[in-house]
Structures are given as C-alpha cells and as structure tokens.
Amino acid sequence: SFLADHAIFKCTNIGSSLKFCLLAEGKADVYPRFTRTMEWDTAAGDAVLRAAGGSTVTLDGTPLTYGKTGTAADFDFANPNFISWGGRKRVLEPA
C-alpha cells in the first residue's frame, strides 16, 4: 500500500546498510521497512544517512532511536517499522 500511495516505481533487493548508503549518496529516494529488523542491522547505515542529512523515522514521525532497554529478550533490540529518506524530503504523506 505504501509503495502504491507514494508512486514508487523501482524496488531494489539489497541489504539494509546498502539501502541507507544509497539514500545518503542520493541514488535512492526512500527506504520503507515494514518487517522486523534489529538495531545491529540498521544502526551503522542509519548513522551514515543522518550524517549526510537524511532521516529515519517511525510510522508516527518520531525519529528512530537506538539502545532501547526495558523489554524482554531480543525485543530490546528490535526496530519498529520505519521509513528513511535522503536529504530534507518529507515522505510520510501520500503523493
């Protein structure tokens, strides 16, 4: 649904860190993630993206945070669904 609502025309199947790097480099526009990932899958790539001026937010628009604690087992390190983009674009609103 997100892809259709935002006129996404091409999808690339590569690892999370590479997706963040493509966003940071300006070679991709958006990285929506609606399935489970862990902090160690995304933290380094997200840091590169943010250093390049991009953003990663949860579906309610809150910046994605790392180092969460206080829940059971591996859930401490599970990411919520998120959307990342390069530059200062706003992508939570449909096109």
UniProtKB/Swiss-Prot annotation:
Supply the PANTHER family for this chain.
Answer: 3'(2'),5'-BISPHOSPHATE NUCLEOTIDASE 1
- The keyword Transmembrane is assigned to this record: no
Matches recorded under InterPro entries: CysQ/Inositol_MonoPase, Inositol_monophosphatase-like, Inositol_monophosphatase_CS
The family assignment reads: Belongs to the inositol monophosphatase superfamily.
Listed GO biological process terms? 3'-phosphoadenosine 5'-phosphosulfate metabolic process; phosphatidylinositol phosphate biosynthetic process; polysaccharide biosynthetic process; sulfate assimilation
Q: Which organism is it from?
A: Rhizobium leguminosarum bv. phaseoli
Query: What's a single GO MF annotation on this record?
Result: 3'(2'),5'-bisphosphate nucleotidase activity
The protein depicted here goes by the name: Uncharacterized protein in pss 5'region
The reply to whether Transferase figures as a keyword in the UniProt entry is no
Q: Pfam family example for this protein?
A: Inositol_P
Keywords from UniProt, A to Z, are: Exopolysaccharide synthesis, Nodulation
The record's Gene3D superfamilies line, in alphabetical order, gives:
3.40.190.80
